């Protein structure tokens, strides 16, 4: 069994890797049930090319809430370069970090 990421930033990075690999199961497991959509499959045809962490607020091993601002870069099916910028909220419940969504989601 794979160890659960100990910080919000590490969970966010593992979720980026899940997008790169097309690992819908990891995305499902790490998405908070209160905001998780029915379909967590990554967008087919996107080639993820990079990730930059812009800022981190809390989200350490001692915290129960955290915010990670990041930009993920990808090339879409039509060959166009794109980026996804998000200020993402994470919560830790039962010693596991979960992705909630954009930081304005309660």
Cite the ranges covered by each PLM segment.
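Surface-exposed, charged secondary-structure patches
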Residues: 43-83
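Tryptophan-centered motif/residue detector
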Residues: 31, 48-50, 97
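Short beta-strand edge/turn micro-motifs at domain boundaries
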Residues: 82-106
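Core segments of small alpha/beta cavity-forming domains
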Residues: 1-44
